[in-house]
Curated annotation (Swiss-Prot):
Domain of life: Eukaryota
GO molecular function: delayed rectifier potassium channel activity; voltage-gated monoatomic ion channel activity
Keywords: Ion channel, Ion transport, Membrane, Potassium, Potassium channel, Potassium transport, Transmembrane, Transmembrane helix, Transport, Voltage-gated channel
Signal peptide start and end residues: none
Organism placement in taxonomy: Eukaryota, Metazoa, Ecdysozoa, Nematoda, Chromadorea
Record SMART domains: BTB
UniProt keyword Ion transport, yes or no: yes
Name the record gives this protein: Potassium voltage-gated channel protein egl-36
UniProt organism field: Caenorhabditis elegans
Amino acid sequence: MLDACSFNRFDSNRSSARRFSRRGSDYFGDKGISMDERIVLNVGGVRHETYQATLKKIPATRLSRLTPSLANFDPLLNEYFFDRHPAVFAMILNYYRTGKLHYPTDVCGPLFEEELQYWGLDASDTEPCCWMQLLHAKDTQETLAVLDRMDADHEDDPQLREQDTMKKFGWEEDYFQGKRTRWMKLKPQMWSLFDEPYSSQAAKLIAGISVLFIFISIFSFCLKTHQSFRLPVLIGQNITMPGGVVQPSIERVSTEPLPIFGQIEMLCNIWFTLELIIRFVFCPSKIRFFKSPLNMIDLVATLSFYADAMMVRVVEDEPKDVVEFLSMIRIFRLFKLTQHHQGLQILIHTFRASAKELILLVFFLILGIVIFAALVYYAEKMEANPNNQFQSIPLGLWWAICTMTTVGYGDMTPHTSFGRLVGSLCAVMGVLTIALPVPVIVSNFAMFYSHNQARDKLPKRRRRVLPVEQIRLQARRHAAVLEPSASQGGLGGGQAIRRRNMPILIDQNCCDEENHNHKHREKSENSDEGTNSSSTTGVDTVVKLGPSETAITTTIIS
């Protein structure tokens, strides 16, 4: 049997709430809100009390538009309830009181910005003393965004990884509609094999083969320039001796590498050509493919090999300088190793993040080089100096570069007193100029590296957190399905229903309707004595969580 006293108390609370609501509406609606009226704000279970005039200091915000007609207002407790972060709200409320917004040190940056956005405030209103913390939070978010792009192809969840792949290839709509052809299955698989080294064991094997060919190509390119691995090029010619006698002779003009190096280059470039064609055919976007610097390096290096081979075979007296320059491009294939090592990727992202500091460093170096080159040129001419090596300012530029970078080859040195003074100042200024931006670059690298190390140690999969709106919608649907089944199966059919306690979150209005229906069912059970043997007894426990949510645990015992 249901407890009638609990329902009587519930009805009395509802009637008192109606009386308070009518009295509150008369007070706030007819007479207006008094600026000296105190307002109670319950934020995350922590009650804050302030004046209405305090909340009106910052217009066009959530707190400046509080009225008793809002769903957040609880007429029983005469307070506004917000399920938000209470510690952050203390700083926000203090902003209304003092007009100064300070950044809390014990709260994460994105959380603080999210709370400010909810209350209708802007993070730019933060006091200057807290700007460093705000900028540090933004830098952290940018770093994590870069690492997210690096790990975009390493999603552990197969379903999410498949969805990301379909989105990358532009087949998202066909994927959700269930339209998948063989080409749509083959193309991402082949692309993953040759472009994502850590996607599978086969991809790791292909990546290992590619790295092996890169090292073999670079190693042979370096070795073939050594004299021990080169053959002399001999040219036979006839020399006319005095007296008209023609004598044949052999002249050593130059050297060429051993034939084995040509075979090694051919084998390596066959692999590079095959890899380049496959990656081009199966790439998600041809435009992005050509925009990639690594792809352009691979394309130019591969084409340079075939250009060298054609020039050697077609042109009899091939231009050696042009051929050697084209072959030098192949050494840039070392940059392809960045695809296979995260440390190199972090280094590249560090240089990108430090681009402003690097540009500033180059600018100051150029400025100092020009100034000290001109100074040392005129300083060496002020005194008699027969060993003057600074015959022009352009020659002084080379000396200034070597001095400011603390290299000091020693091929050019000042010999006069003023020249040595200029050289000393040049060396000191070079040390200061180079040393100042270095900590910023090191800090960026340490930030990228530490975040990447922490990301590798953290679990990839996290617990899924549902939004509150989705939970409330599911609760309403569950309550709508549960009520007819309980009334039909328990009262009408006479069948015993056994259920476990099911705590659900529903809206306050749904709670009122549910209790009202139970109350009517109790009256029908008391009036009908013939159905006691087949009826069920329901006990409902109502636990108040807030003004807009109530947890109901329903237990039906046979």
